[in-house]
Amino acid sequence: MAHKKGVGSSRNGRDSDGQRLGCKKFGGEAVKAGNIIYRQHGTKIHPGNNVGLGKDYTLFALIEGVVKFERMGRDRKKVSVYPAN
């Protein structure tokens, strides 16, 4: 007979770090060209005026200006950058 108790191993105990998705610049905030506005998987938010779409669906400013979130119809959203006056 074993004189030490068998120790079971847990199959849990793993949790990956979050991917830091979401809004990086909010409506009304000033941005420079190249600033990341929104990180996402898929087009949760679409690119509007003066906003580029990266290959990983990151939205970024193409010009210096102010961020504005807008609606495209009833169920879609877009983000645009307009020059600050």
Swiss-Prot record:
It comes from the Bacteria. Disulfide bonds: none annotated. One of its GO terms (cellular component) is cytosolic large ribosomal subunit. Keywords: Ribonucleoprotein, Ribosomal protein. GO terms for molecular function: structural constituent of ribosome. It holds the Pfam family Ribosomal_L27. One of its GO terms (biological process) is translation. Residues 1-21 are annotated as: Disordered. HAMAP family: Ribosomal_bL27. Belongs to the bacterial ribosomal protein bL27 family. This is Large ribosomal subunit protein bL27. It comes from Geobacter sp. (strain M21).
